[in-house]
Amino acid sequence: WIMGHMVNEIYQIDEFVDLGANSIETDITFDDNAMEEYSFHGVPCDCRRYCHKWEYTNTFLDGLRRATTPGDSKFRKELALVVFDLKTGDLSSSTANKGGKLFGQKLLQHYWKGGNNGGRAYIILSIPDLDHYAFISGFKEALKTAGHEELLAKVGYDFSGNDDLGSTRTALNKAGVKDREHVWQSDGITNCVSTLFRGLDRVKKAVSNRDSSNGYINKVYHWTVDKYGSVRDALDAGVDGVMTNDPDVIVNVLNESKYKGKLRLATYDDNPWETFKP
């Protein structure tokens, strides 16, 4: 999976898909009442990027729906997976549940069109703080209450704070997410700091967990990876996805002889909740 990083304005969807992304990551901010507000990152952000692009969440979700709805003039068939980087820092452990409910209702209304022929992309809820696991509980509850529990088949989960894997598993279980129930595990650092500085130890532990008989992870992705050497290192470590500001770099690496016969770009027909076994 080539995961386009920080796609916060609608026009950037085409920009990143044109460069080779089959997945995008979008930042979502929240107000003091736990209501999502904008698709917005703000400063600081990755080097070589403008940090202030934004849309109102409703507007972005409407544009995203069009980009992932077959038959729409804006449809991009390559775009199969969307990661919502949920900026829950201003939420408390008690308001996280409310935030999840409100975001679930918002997705149902603006992305899934009330469950009637909305966008088809798979969705990952990515949360930076393990203490906010109740966001997931609230999100699931909102869809169940609305009578659209079936849409949870399209929803996966990630904690992005580089926490201990055992603690991450516990937080997921507290949220009502079973082991290997649509679980992606991220690991990474801003591109302003070399990925060599962070190293790949935790990535390798996550891959080992994914491949073990008693793990909790379905897929592993590494962020934010823009340099050719770092892409190769991540692929060699066995990741399923690479989050990047430069999708074309990942495309070029995948076309190298070492990887060409072994790896390919995922399509909509590839279930992102199934662990890949080569």
Swiss-Prot record:
It is found in: Secreted. Keywords: Cytolysis, Dermonecrotic toxin, Disulfide bond, Hemolysis, Lipid degradation, Lipid metabolism, Lyase, Magnesium, Metal-binding, Secreted, Toxin. Disulfide bonds join C45-C51, C47-C192. It catalyses: an N-(acyl)-sphingosylphosphocholine = an N-(acyl)-sphingosyl-1,3-cyclic phosphate + choline; an N-(acyl)-sphingosylphosphoethanolamine = an N-(acyl)-sphingosyl-1,3-cyclic phosphate + ethanolamine; a 1-acyl-sn-glycero-3-phosphocholine = a 1-acyl-sn-glycero-2,3-cyclic phosphate + choline; a 1-acyl-sn-glycero-3-phosphoethanolamine = a 1-acyl-sn-glycero-2,3-cyclic phosphate + ethanolamine. Its cofactor is Mg(2+). One of its GO terms (biological process) is lipid catabolic process. It comes from the Eukaryota. This is Dermonecrotic toxin LhSicTox-alphaIV1i. The lineage of its organism: Eukaryota, Metazoa, Ecdysozoa, Arthropoda, Chelicerata.
